[in-house]
């Protein structure tokens, strides 16, 4: 990790130092995704079977996972892991249940009633990546709020062969339909529907560059997605009271995600920075994914700040996905932290807790999007509608205001919609 003293940098250098690794969708990826889209839209299930053989090296008998397959998968999972998943599910349920919208129903003036009503998104699709490490925790993060929100149909896609942990967790969360479909083809299948796959209104879940590009394309064509996606990242604010081993472990927990991940340490203590660098090397030696972590560390940085106030300013400028605060009285900094997907306060709140079981959602905006986007929550699985209802007297009292405004905007039909009613009321 490169170490930089913040106050020695000019504005351009600061901006460059806070930059992320470049994210560019290559022409090859775009062309490949376009070909997959055309194939799925034109050939439906047939394309999905062919693509499973091509990309997943799997010959499928059915795209739909049977209840018997789910039951067999559940039996193969250790009891201890089942209990851990159930504990995490309970915490996630409690946190998201508490996010239910409060009723908004009031008179803005006498006889003018305004409301906000919330309705679930009817049909949602969840995408869970495959690979060597099954992300069954993401099933919890997506399926639990979808159920609490009351989504009518929840389907899940994951590349075959689907890990037992994913099948067990999906079933535990009440997902009734699971498809053995991965990659960009899963996104296009859920967005457009096929003979077997139900069309959905919104798609959730992470994925590789092909999945990300497919989600971008379906968003342009009318299917909603959860949020823009990018490489994983963490920023740690630490002072002289922080444990360098703890700080190093938090940085490495993100660095091991992928070579394009980025980790940032911001501290007002040079000694802590040096101790953390030593601890990183010691811990790297014990990590199975050390090579991946080293690649991420190559474009990661340590910033030496003047004081904690400057640490906060740097963090807000970077706008991290994960923000770990390991300082004395960490909660005292919270009112000044404006841009982060999820914040972890104190020495015993590692980012891993939020990734799995504290109850917060680990689906977070990255790449600086936390300036304008929020962590995934119950609201993402529902939509708000406003309602207004006016009594005759309420209408009369507000009529002149509306007619004056409509006339000023030269929208005569708007004005007449009020004037016609007002005339009939005065005749009664």
UniProtKB/Swiss-Prot annotation:
Keywords, ordered alphabetically: Amino-acid biosynthesis, Histidine biosynthesis, Metal-binding, NAD, Oxidoreductase, Zinc
Pathway(s) the chain acts in: Amino-acid biosynthesis; L-histidine biosynthesis; L-histidine from 5-phospho-alpha-D-ribose 1-diphosphate: step 9/9
Cofactor remark: Binds 1 zinc ion per subunit.
EC number in record: 1.1.1.23
Protein role: Catalyzes the sequential NAD-dependent oxidations of L-histidinol to L-histidinaldehyde and then to L-histidine.
Name listed for the protein in its UniProt record: Histidinol dehydrogenase
Reactions mediated catalytically: L-histidinol + 2 NAD(+) + H2O = L-histidine + 2 NADH + 3 H(+)
One GO location term (cellular component): cytosol
Gene: hisD
Catalytic residues of the enzyme: 321-322
Membrane-spanning parts: none
Enzyme class: oxidoreductase
Family matches, as HAMAP family: HisD
Biological processes, Gene Ontology terms: L-histidine biosynthetic process
Residues given in the record as NAD(+) binding sites: 127, 185, 208
Organism: Pasteurella multocida (strain Pm70)
Family note: Belongs to the histidinol dehydrogenase family.
Pfam families: Histidinol_dh
Keyword ATP-binding annotated: no
């Amino acid at each position: 990790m490169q170490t930089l003293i913040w106050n020695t940098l000019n504005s351009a250098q600061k901006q460059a130092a806070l930059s992320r690794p470049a994210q560019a969708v290559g022409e090859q990826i775009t062309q490949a995704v376009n070909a997959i889209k055309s194939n799925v839209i034109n050939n439906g299930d047939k394309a999905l079977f062919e693509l499973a053989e091509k990309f997943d090296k799997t010959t499928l008998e059915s795209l739909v996972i049977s209840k018997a397959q789910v039951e067999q998968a559940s039996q193969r999972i250790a009891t201890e892991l089942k209990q851990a998943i159930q504990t995490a599910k309970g915490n996630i349920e409690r946190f998201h249940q508490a996010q239910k919208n409060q009723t908004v129903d009031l008179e803005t003036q006498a006889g003018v009633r305004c409301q906000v009503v919330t309705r679930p998104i009817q049909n949602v699709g969840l995408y869970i990546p495959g690979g060597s490490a099954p992300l069954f925790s993401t099933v919890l993060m997506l399926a639990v709020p979808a159920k609490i929100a009351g989504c009518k149909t929840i389907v899940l896609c994951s590349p075959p062969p689907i890990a037992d942990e994913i099948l067990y967790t999906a079933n535990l969360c009440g997902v009734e339909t699971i498809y053995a479909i991965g990659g960009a083809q899963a996104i296009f299948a859920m967005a457009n529907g096929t003979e077997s796959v139900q069309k959905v209104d919104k798609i959730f879940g992470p994925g590789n560059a092909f999945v990300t590009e497919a989600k971008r394309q379906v968003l342009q064509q009318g299917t909603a997605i959860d949020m823009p996606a990018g490489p994983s990242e963490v920023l740690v604010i630490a002072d002289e009271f922080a444990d360098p081993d703890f700080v190093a472990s938090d940085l490495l927990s993100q660095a091991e995600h992928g070579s394009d991940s980025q980790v940032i340490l911001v501290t007002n203590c040079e000694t802590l920075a040096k101790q953390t660098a030593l601890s990183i090397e010691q811990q790297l030696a014990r990590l199975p994914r050390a090579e991946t972590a080293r690649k991420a560390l190559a474009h990661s940085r340590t910033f030496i700040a003047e004081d904690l106030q400057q640490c906060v300013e740097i963090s807000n400028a970077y706008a991290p996905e994960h923000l770990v605060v390991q300082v004395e009285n960490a909660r005292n900094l919270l009112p000044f932290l404006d841009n982060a997907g999820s914040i972890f306060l104190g020495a015993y709140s590692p980012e891993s807790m939020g990734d799995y079981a504290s109850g917060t959602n680990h689906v977070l905006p990255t790449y600086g999007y936390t300036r304008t986007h929020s962590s995934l929550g119950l609201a993402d699985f529902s939509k708000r509608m406003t309602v207004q209802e006016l009594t005759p007297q309420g209408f009369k009292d507000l009529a002149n205001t509306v007619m004056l405004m409509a006339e000023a905007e030269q929208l005569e039909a708007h004005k007449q919609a009020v004037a016609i009613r007002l005339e009939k009321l005065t005749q009664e």
